[in-house]
């Protein structure tokens, strides 16, 4: 008989417990709800409302009317600038292609794939090292290089919907983080120890611009100790300092790169000119210079005869006197001035020219007070010379463009320019351009800036260049394949050599240029060859330039485990990356410290793998390409014979005696088999054995792998068999597919194992298709089995296994594996108790070369951990500064003023007011290189490391997405409100339990922080008052075995 429901309710008349209270309903007003009807809002209302939410500029006439908002605003304008969050997301998107076309399009041949790999692994030092090795001005070029015409233009992701990678922004970010580390450059130990008399030869470089700084840096890395750069100005940096505006290239960046050159012994003398009265080539040679590099650029403007007689007083500038004047007044630290006025630009400005310099002049004029700027040029938009980045910047800042216009006359009244007249230009059927005198345009203006290029024509400079031959244009005659002049001891690069058009190409003229068919050697290498030849040392034509080097690269990351010395703790796991002997050899050649062979057995247990067997994991959602969070495999052990692997071990140990070979072996549960295979492997020369007792699929049917590894008794007995027959260390491989991995590890130790490997893959069923079939599916019958999941998805499981074994068996060696994909994640395993690190899925995601990133990353982490001045850093990540879109916030702490709609307009007005009152030459907000550099008392070794709150939201960084609000509503405690007008979330402290869900889902790192509660802690909302209120734990402790120890206060506090 069915019992009758109890209808008596003691809470009759009270509010429903299963329904939100009115205050919570009010809080939930903006929380998403399932929509049951179609929306219908009049377009007129939407048109009006959208202005309340806009984050971009208004379009149409109203957007450009009124005074410029840019006066005195020299803040970073680059769209490519990234925060750490943006850099990581962009780097993770990169495909890291084979034979990367982006690198082929870079004049300095940066290893772009490698440095982006390092960024995605949070190894910013490794990325900066890769960049600065090929380009000593890597930060400068990251900021101003026209990447759309170079590396970005060749990015394979141009063929995808999401578009090319922001390579320049990533380069800028990595180098900027290294700049903040404040670590000096040094000459490598190898070079220092191999210096000879030739390295004491004098080398002179004229002009302290990009080409000279680059050339001098490479020569210093080659070991030369007497290198001097002569600069005619009182400040250094050449065009980078004088002619590229602060909002594109801050002076502290130039200062940083020059400091790196000085670190390796480059000397710089300012106020030294190339002229008969001071420096000439003949004088330098007579004073002992063995080689000279000329990098003076083109110092004089090309001026149309139309403008002869016009001066600044009339309102006429050239780019060569305008941009330096702007720089002197807006670049803190450049000339040591405390305050210098900007050139006054009240009214209308016309800029003549269509190159990058013209765009810089135009956008600078807006910051000097111009109300309107027009850029006039002879041809149409399709023939414009400026790179797209510069063109778009000028367009966004509301510069006007006047194409097909050639200046014919400037009208002056009362000593001031009042207008400029243009002839329209036309192109005939033969493609020839001409001016149409019948079509005239008159443009009223107050200032004219000529940006028609530059040249070298000053007689005193040309005479100082003798005996070098000049070309028909008056420049230096240079062999473009060697950068050598008519005088064998004189070299030239940059603008003065007539080839380079950009900073990155000037940098390259100081190093080497890759042609499609062969390498062209130029200045630094050829100067090195020339000097060495004088001393009887013949060098090949292929450049061999040393890489960028710092004290970080001297950190020792070797490890001693069980008496075996590992060069570094990174090795390849027994997995697809070690399928064959040649693959193991290539791994050693790339720098891996050790390898494990693919697991092999006796010939009687040979297997044949099925196909398909390794598939993309579903743990990362619809993510295709690299950076998969997991793989699922039903891979079996090696298909190759036992003798094949024994011979490979012999060859590998013979040719790579300092590398460690670990033989991964597997047998059925049979004493004779284990003894035979173990002794053969030891005799072949294996340094260590790994006993595969944990393969989760395919081998259990034969009584191998997991069939043995889940029983402590069987593991212990197998270990005893192996211990009795071999002297080398051996490590049973643990399975995570068990209740307590510590029991198996304890059994292995008791059986005489030297240590354990933790862990193998996690048994899983990854994909189930809509038709009910699993993937992978084998053959026509579509058979499958539970496979092994690997990759970062299993890292928490593997980390727990390593930590629990290390806590249970103090000092017991552990080879860790399972989701190790960077130096940072590897260091985490080492700190949890691992001795060395095995890698598999990360190589499947990329290639063998990731080991270089891991090694440099680990060295940097160890080095920086010893620096007291960087104690606020998290590994290689600097403290998160308040920012929007990667740029610092000028006005902080403005409550109820988000960055959209009318609030944005109000913020811009306040910012303009603050900028108008600010001193542009104040250095307080810039990070200049300082020496001595970051000091480290003691660098830890790898072996050294082997062993209540509420939320607060930072409205300066918040992007108003409401993710915190939604997750707190539907997965938490309804402790966050969300303003309907400002879209600003607010945490109600009394309701916040400190669960950190909001912190976990926030897309902006450190926008939400967990801080100590200000008010007294209140008891949880019990819903219905309990009959007994248990005591609140005062202290929560965990013992070494992971058991919780409670010390109760006996009552509420």
Swiss-Prot record:
Enzyme class: oxidoreductase
InterPro entries assigned to the protein according to its UniProt record, in alphabetical order: 4Fe4S_Fe-S-bd, 4Fe4S_Fe_S_CS, Aldolase_TIM, Dihydroorotate_DH_cat, DPD_II, FAD/NAD-bd_sf, FAD/NAD-binding_dom, Helical_ferredxn
Residues in the signal sequence: none
UniProt binding sites for [4Fe-4S] cluster 3: 958, 961, 964, 968
DNA damage recorded as keyword: no
GO process annotations (BP): beta-alanine biosynthetic process; thymine catabolic process; uracil catabolic process
Amino acids binding [4Fe-4S] cluster 2: 106, 145, 151, 171
Positions of FAD binding: 207-211, 231-239, 248, 274, 494-503
GO cellular component terms attached to this protein's record: cytosol
Binding site for [4Fe-4S] cluster 4: 992, 995, 998, 1002
Domain of life: Eukaryota
Binding-site residues, [4Fe-4S] cluster 1: 94, 97, 102, 155
Amino acids binding substrate: 633, 692-694, 760-761
Protein name (record): Probable dihydropyrimidine dehydrogenase [NADP(+)]
Organism: Caenorhabditis briggsae
Source lineage: Eukaryota, Metazoa, Ecdysozoa, Nematoda, Chromadorea
Chain's gene name: dpyd-1
């Amino acid at each position: 008989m069915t019992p009758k429901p109890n209808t008596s309710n003691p809470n009759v008349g009270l509010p429903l417990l299963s329904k939100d209270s009115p205050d919570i309903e009010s809080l939930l007003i903006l929380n998403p709800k399932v929509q049951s009807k179609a929306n219908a809002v009049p377009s007129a209302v939407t048109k009006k409302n959208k202005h309340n939410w806009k984050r971009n500029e208004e379009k149409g006439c109203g957007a450009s009317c009124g005074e410029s908002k840019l006066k005195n605003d020299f803040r970073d304008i680059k769209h490519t600038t990234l925060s750490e969050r943006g850099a990581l997301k962009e780097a993770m998107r990169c495909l890291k292609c084979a034979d990367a076309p982006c690198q082929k399009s870079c004049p300095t041949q940066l290893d772009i794939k490698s440095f982006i790999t390092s960024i995605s692994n949070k190894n910013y030092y490794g990325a900066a090292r890769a960049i600065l090795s090929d380009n000593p001005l890597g930060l400068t070029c990251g900021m101003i290089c026209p990447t759309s015409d170079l590396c970005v233009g060749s990015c394979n992701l141009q063929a995808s919907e999401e578009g090319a990678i922001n390579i320049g922004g990533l380069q800028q970010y990595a180098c900027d983080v290294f700049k903040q580390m404040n670590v000096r450059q040094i000459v490598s130990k190898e070079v220092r120890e191999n210096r000879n008399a030739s390295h004491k030869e004098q080398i002179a470089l004229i002009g302290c611009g990009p080409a000279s700084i680059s050339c001098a840096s490479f020569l210093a890395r080659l070991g030369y100790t007497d290198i001097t750069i002569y600069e005619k100005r009182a400040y250094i940096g050449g065009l980078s300092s004088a002619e590229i505006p602060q909002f594109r290239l801050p002076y502290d960046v130039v200062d940083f790169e020059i400091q790196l050159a000085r670190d390796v012994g480059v000397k710089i003398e300012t106020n030294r000119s190339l002229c008969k009265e001071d420096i000439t080539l003949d004088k330098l040679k007579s004073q002992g210079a063995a080689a000279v590099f000329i990098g003076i650029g083109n110092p004089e403007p090309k001026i149309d005869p139309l403008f002869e007689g016009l001066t600044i007083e009339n309102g006429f500038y050239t780019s060569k006197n305008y941009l330096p004047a702007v720089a002197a007044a807006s670049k803190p630290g450049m000339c040591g001035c405390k305050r210098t006025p900007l050139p006054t630009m009240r009214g209308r400005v016309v800029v003549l020219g269509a190159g990058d310099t013209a765009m810089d002049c135009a956008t600078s004029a807006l910051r000097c007070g111009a109300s309107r700027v027009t850029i006039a040029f002879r041809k149409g938009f399709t023939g414009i010379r400026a790179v797209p980045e510069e063109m778009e910047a000028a367009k966004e800042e509301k510069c006007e463009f006047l194409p097909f216009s050639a200046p014919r006359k400037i009208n002056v009244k009362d000593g001031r320019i009042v207008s400029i007249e243009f002839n329209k230009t036309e192109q005939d059927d033969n493609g020839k351009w001409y001016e149409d005198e019948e079509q005239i345009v008159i443009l009223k203006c107050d200032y004219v800036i000529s940006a028609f290029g530059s040249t070298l024509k000053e007689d005193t400079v040309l005479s100082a260049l003798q005996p070098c031959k000049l070309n028909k244009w008056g420049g230096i005659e240079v062999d473009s394949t060697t950068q050598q002049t008519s005088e064998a001891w004189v070299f030239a690069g940059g603008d003065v050599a007539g080839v380079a058009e950009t900073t990155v190409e000037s940098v390259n003229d100081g190093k080497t240029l890759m042609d499609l068919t062969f390498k062209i050697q130029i200045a630094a290498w050829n100067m090195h060859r020339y000097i060495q030849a004088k001393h009887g040392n013949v060098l090949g034509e292929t450049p061999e330039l040393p890489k960028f080097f710092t004290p970080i690269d001297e950190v020792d990351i070797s490890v001693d485990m069980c008496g075996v010395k590992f060069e570094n703790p990174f090795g390849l796991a027994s997995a697809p990356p070690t399928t064959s002997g040649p693959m193991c050899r290539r791994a050693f050649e790339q720098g891996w410290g050790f390898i494990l062979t693919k697991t092999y057995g006796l010939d009687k247990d040979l297997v044949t793998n099925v196909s398909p067997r390794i598939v993309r994991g579903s743990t990362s959602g619809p993510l295709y390409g690299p950076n998969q969070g997991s793989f699922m495999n039903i891979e079996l052990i090696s298909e190759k014979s036992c003798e094949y692997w024994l011979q490979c071990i012999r060859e590998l140990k013979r040719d790579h005696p300092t590398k460690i070979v670990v033989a991964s072996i597997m047998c059925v549960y049979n004493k004779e088999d284990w003894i035979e295979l173990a002794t053969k492997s030891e005799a072949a020369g294996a340094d260590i054995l790994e006993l595969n007792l944990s393969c989760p699929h395919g081998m259990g049917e034969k009584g191998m792998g997991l069939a043995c590894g889940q029983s402590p008794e069987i593991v212990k007995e197998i270990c005893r068999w192996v211990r009795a027959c071999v002297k080398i260390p051996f490590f049973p491989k643990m399975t995570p597919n068990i209740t307590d991995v510590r029991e198996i590890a304890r059994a292995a130790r008791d059986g005489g194992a030297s240590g354990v490997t933790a862990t193998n893959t996690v048994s899983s069923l990854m994909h189930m298709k809509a038709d009910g079939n699993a993937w992978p599916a084998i053959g026509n019958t579509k058979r499958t089995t539970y496979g092994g999941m690997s990759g970062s998805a299993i890292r928490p499981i593997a980390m727990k296994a390593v930590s629990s074994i290390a806590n249970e068996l103090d000092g017991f060696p552990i080879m860790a594996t399972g989701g190790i994909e960077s130096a940072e994640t590897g260091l985490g395993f080492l700190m949890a108790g691992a001795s060395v690190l095995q890698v598999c899925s990360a190589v499947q995601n990329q290639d063998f070369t990731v080991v270089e990133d891991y090694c440099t990353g680990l060295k940097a982490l160890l080095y920086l951990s010893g620096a007291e001045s960087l104690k606020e850093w998290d590994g290689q990540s600097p403290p998160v500064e308040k920012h929007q879109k990667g740029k610092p916030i000028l006005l902080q702490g403005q409550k109820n003023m988000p960055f959209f709609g009318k609030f944005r307009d109000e913020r811009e007005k306040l910012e303009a007011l603050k900028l108008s009152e600010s001193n542009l030459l104040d250095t307080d907000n810039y990070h200049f290189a300082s020496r001595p550099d970051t000091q480290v008392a003691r660098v830890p070794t790898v072996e050294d490391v082997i062993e209540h709150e509420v939320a607060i939201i930072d409205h300066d960084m918040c992007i108003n997405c409401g993710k915190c609000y939604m997750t707190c509503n539907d997965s938490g405690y309804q402790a966050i409100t969300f303003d309907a007008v400002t879209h600003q979330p607010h945490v109600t402290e009394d309701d916040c339990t400190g669960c950190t869900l909001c912190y976990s889902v926030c897309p902006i790192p450190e926008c939400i922080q967990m801080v100590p509660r200000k008010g007294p802690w209140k008891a949880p909302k019990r819903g219905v008052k309990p009959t007994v209120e248990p005591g609140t734990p005062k202290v929560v402790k965990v013992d070494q075995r992971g058991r919780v120890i409670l010390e109760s206060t006996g009552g509420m506090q």
